[in-house]
Amino acid sequence: LAIISRRRMMCEMTPLFARIAVGVLAVAVACPTTVSAEPTHLMVRAQSVDAKFMGTHTGGVAVTVTDERSGKVLAKGMIKGGTGDTERIMEKAHARWQVISDAETAGYDASLDIEAPTLVRVDARGPMGASAAAITVSSTLWMLPGRNVLGDGLVLTFPGLIITPATTRNPDGTLRIDAQVTMMCGCPITPGGIWDAKDYTVTGYVLDHGHVVATATMHYAGQPSQFTFGDLKIARNRLSVRLVASSNLTPNVGVVETDIGN
């Protein structure tokens, strides 16, 4: 009789356990576990063509990372830091896979919240401290959740030269034109240096309402990155000067215009 009673009790309890199990399953379905996006890191760097990394010295580089397909902004920030080790970057041969940046080298560590393989677009604009020289360089690449791109990371190369112009009226009425010309990273141009002054051409064009009325081939002025032309005869005030600097060996070119003071 005792055995029969226990069997009867188990049979009566079974529907109760079944109802509890169904209830738990319903709660689980209604409240699924939330899976957050996994932070994935992308190091972005900007390097001047034939030179070093761009960073704080020239005002930094603004970076925006977007989902190429949806247009959603995934990260925004600034490339800041130093220009890197000159010997490692410019003077020594690089082996394949060799990292040429170091802990002090300018970069932006973009943290991306992605849940699936994502095609991202990286737009970088700079140097922000030299607006006339600033350009935008872009690239797209696939990023995988949890697969960080670090070390040198994604290196975007920036062709160009930074020109800082100055004009001075001499007492005899002639015009002196000065220009400071550097690489996009701010590195100097000097005779016999890594960026040799003989490999660069700097020309000044005097403009009258957009038309060239005089031309001056500028020469190295004795100080790093300084070029000058000191005795240009012009007949009128309210003119402007266009300065053009170019490398004889690379795509690097810089252009800037400035008004001539009275």
Question: Can you say where each PLM-predicted feature lies in the sequence?
Answer:
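Short, compositionally biased P/S/T/A/G/V-rich stretches that sit at domain boundaries
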Residues: 142-187, 262
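Aromatic sugar-binding surface patches on proteins
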Residues: 84-108, 221-228
